[in-house]
Regions:
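Short, ordered loop/turn segments at secondary-structure junctions
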Residues: 36, 89-91, 198, 239
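Active-site neighborhoods of metal-dependent hydrolases
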Residues: 133-137, 143, 149-159, 166-172, ...
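Divalent-metal coordination cores built from histidine and acidic residues
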Residues: 69-192, 229
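Histidine-rich, glycine-flanked metal-binding segment
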Residues: 2-55
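Active-site neighborhood of phospho(di)ester-bond hydrolases with catalytic His/Asp-centered motifs
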Residues: 53-60, 86-88, 237, 270
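Di-metal (Zn2+ and/or Mg2+/Mn2+) metal-binding site signature of metallo-dependent hydrolases
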Residues: 52-75
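Targeting-peptide/extracellular-domain and disordered-appendage signature
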Residues: 391-428
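Divalent metal-coordination and catalytic microenvironments
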Residues: 9, 29, 49, 60, ...
Length: 428
């Protein structure tokens, strides 16, 4: 007798074959039968019209803190994900040196926009070594499977302390100490190692991430910790010095290849198109294809959708944040800020101003992409387009929708009318 039969579902089996209708029988937690099932079962579920798929494996997540208090890995569990890989982009919470917890929180808050207050409340930091961190997670119940990578930034901070935050070059002794900690973590069960080299990644305090300028000697020295082990993967996120000089692309990519060679393991790297990057993604693809042809196991991580951020007056980012007229009231409680922004004189002033170039903590950065915004916070709905003009960031009032129509109708017409793709824009 089977434990469970799911009847008449549309099955996507993960092989690349076309979807098909079938029954699926489960016994002892594993698929036992597939097809038209007449075997008796303790439970039968009619599922016509439902899709039945293998569980998804999400290889790029940042549950490093949440995993220590949330057994569900929400929201991934709600989207069919059954395995997650954490510790990406070189940020995480282990190894940890007591007294430096706030620095790790500021790092994750700044890079991944995870609220620092939630991390400070939820992450207990009842570990020091990476092995102890894994033991803490392993002792908790979890609804889905997970694996963890050793992030470069905490590793560097554990060995170099304040020198890591100052981005000092690692000495041979520093590299040897980091390599030992990494090797110990891999032998304890860590899935891999990650590093981040993006100019857009900053801590919540506006600092560059500790390992973003790590030398070739440091990167290859750490990668060599994988030698002789039967498992492991390296993960790299890099913008290849996009905001500095196009001539830096190849030297930066050379570092990625050097890490793969030194490790003898597979290397997975983020593959994104960034504005103002032109067609950098094609250059990345060409270098990867050449490396693979030469025998290096490089793999690309491609996002299945456009990546944006949450914007709002009570969020980390919103289009008003750089305008002097807003910054005067930025520290007021939300209700008082909203009231101040309803003042016609302040509204007119903000719309006439140009924004400073800012990041989350107020440091100058280059604005990445134009975006459109829909607001219901003033006297009726208003749509805006934010864009660069002459190297500066402008916030333009471009349309007041017909209030007799649903806002998404007039907003969509607005975007189409100015030649912007509706689905490619983050909308608030």
């Amino acid at each position: 007798m089977l434990d469970w039969v799911i009847e008449g579902a549309t099955v996507v089996d993960g092989t690349g074959a076309e979807p098909f209708t079938a029954d699926v029988g489960v016994q002892d937690g594993r698929i036992a039968e597939l097809g038209r099932i007449t075997t008796a079962a303790r439970q039968r579920t009619a599922a016509p019209g439902a899709w039945l798929t293998p569980g998804f494996v999400d290889i790029h997540t940042h549950y490093d803190g949440q995993a220590s208090w949330d057994e569900t890995f929400s929201p991934s569990i709600h989207h069919g994900v059954t395995t997650v890989l954490m510790g990406n982009c070189g940020v995480g919470f282990a190894p940890n040196v007591p007294g430096r917890e706030a620095e790790l929180i500021a790092l994750m808050e700044g890079v991944e926009d995870i609220p620092g207050a939630a991390l400070a409340e939820g992450v207990k930091f009842n570990w020091q070594s990476f092995g102890q961190y894994m033991d803490v997670l392993d002792a908790m119940p979890h609804s889905i499977d997970f694996a963890v990578q050793v992030p470069h930034d905490p590793l560097r901070m554990a060995v170099m302390g304040s020198r890591a935050l100052a981005q000092e070059a690692a000495s041979p002794e520093d590299i040897a100490a980091m390599r030992t900690l990494l090797r110990d973590a891999l032998q304890a069960g860590a899935a891999g190692f990650s590093t981040g080299r993006s100019d857009n990644h900053r801590t919540a305090r506006g600092q560059e991430t500790p390992a973003s300028e790590a030398s070739a000697a440091e990167l290859t020295g750490l990668a060599s910790a994988f030698q002789g082990l039967g498992h492991g993967v390296l993960q790299v996120v890099s913008d290849f010095d996009l905001l500095r000089s196009a001539e830096r692309f190849n030297p930066e990519f050379d570092l990625v290849e050097a890490m793969a060679r030194a490790s003898g393991k597979k290397l997975s790297m983020t593959w994104l198109q960034r504005d103002p990057g032109g067609e950098q993604w094609k250059a990345i693809q060409a270098r990867v294809e050449a490396a693979v042809a030469a025998g290096l196991p490089l793999y690309l991580q491609a996002a299945s959708r456009g990546i944006g951020v949450i914007n709002g007056l009570d969020a980390s980012f919103h289009p008003f944040m750089g305008f002097p007229g807003y910054k005067e009231v930025a520290r007021l409680p939300l209700a008082q800020r909203a009231a101040a922004l309803r003042d016609p004189a302040r509204k007119a002033r903000i719309l006439a101003e140009k924004s400073e170039r800012i990041s989350g903590d107020g440091t100058p950065v280059q604005v990445s992409v134009p975006f459109a915004v829909h607001f219901q916070t003033f006297d009726g709905p208003t749509d805006f387009l934010a864009d660069r003009r002459d190297g500066e960031y402008w916030f333009l009032k471009v349309y007041e929708p017909d209030i007799d129509l649903p806002w998404w109708v007039t907003f969509g017409l607005l975007l189409l009318g100015i030649g912007l793709p509706v689905l490619a824009l983050p909308v608030v």
